[in-house]
Regions:
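Conserved TIR/SEFIR loop-to-helix hotspot centered on a Trp-containing motif
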Residues: 75-91
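Acidic, Ser/Thr-rich peripheral helices and adjacent loops at domain boundaries
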Residues: 114-151
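Conserved N-terminal substructure of TIR/SEFIR domains
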Residues: 1-67, 95-97, 155, 159, ...
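Short, acidic/small-residue loops that bind anionic groups at enzyme active sites
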Residues: 91-103
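Short beta-alpha junction loops
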Residues: 101-117
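Conserved beta-strand segments of the P-loop GTPase G domain that flank and frequently precede/overlap
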Residues: 10, 70-74, 104-105
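Short acidic, S/G/P-rich loop/turn micro-motifs used as interaction or catalytic elements
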Residues: 14-18, 75-78, 109-111
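Short, glycine/charged-enriched secondary-structure capping and boundary segments
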Residues: 22-25, 83-86, 116-119
Length: 185
């Protein structure tokens, strides 16, 4: 089997677009395809039931994705669309099997969270659903790397993990964007 996977990249569009561009340029050839995060404000009615929202994202935006990558910048954890994309990508549906999941800490994460030692992270400053899945052994988190072989290895491991570990999708979905320095349960 090839180690080239179709990946979906979830990121904070307003703050981390430049990193998404760098990521796509640097690593695009290592993957079968990169699908950038594309659920925008107004695309999905937030008043729909949670299951309907997740199903729409899974079937309309994340079709045929092998692995979801979350680019984690300074305020990524606050975004409802990122929460929805993570929750939808780890759902196993008739039309689409669940995706593997991993997070990559961007340089902007450590620039903003100066008290967090490089190579580490504060669990309350990454997307809560991603953290739940790191704890469950379904997801992993890594520091930004410029080495395509390293990143491709992370993606392949996430792809393999999706069959050997169960995701945790028990957290209530964000109803709106959050604010503050960190999340609380």
């Amino acid at each position: 089997m090839s180690n080239r996977h179709k990946v979906f990249v979830s990121y904070h569009h307003a703050l981390d677009e430049s990193y998404m561009r760098i990521f796509a340029l640097r690593f695009g050839n290592a993957f079968r395809a990169i699908v950038p995060g594309s659920v925008q404000v107004g695309d999905i009615d937030p008043n729909l039931p949670t299951e309907t929202i997740r199903q729409k994202i899974r079937d309309e935006y994340l079709r045929d994705i092998s692995v979801t990558i979350v680019l984690i910048g300074a305020l990524t954890w606050q975004r409802k669309h990122i929460d929805w994309e993570i929750g939808s990508s780890i759902r196993d549906t008739k039309a689409n099997p669940r995706s593997g999941l991993l997070g990559i800490l961007l340089p902007s994460y450590h620039a903003h969270h100066v008290r967090v030692e490089r190579g580490r992270y504060n669990p309350r400053t990454i997307p809560p659903r991603l953290y739940d899945n790191i704890k469950a052994g379904f997801a992993s988190i890594h520091n930004w790397s410029e080495d395509p072989a390293t990143v491709q290895g992370w993606i392949h491991q996430a792809y393999l993990r999706k069959s050997s570990a169960l995701p945790d999708n028990s957290r209530a979905s964000f109803g709106k964007n959050r604010s503050g320095d960190e999340w609380n349960d």
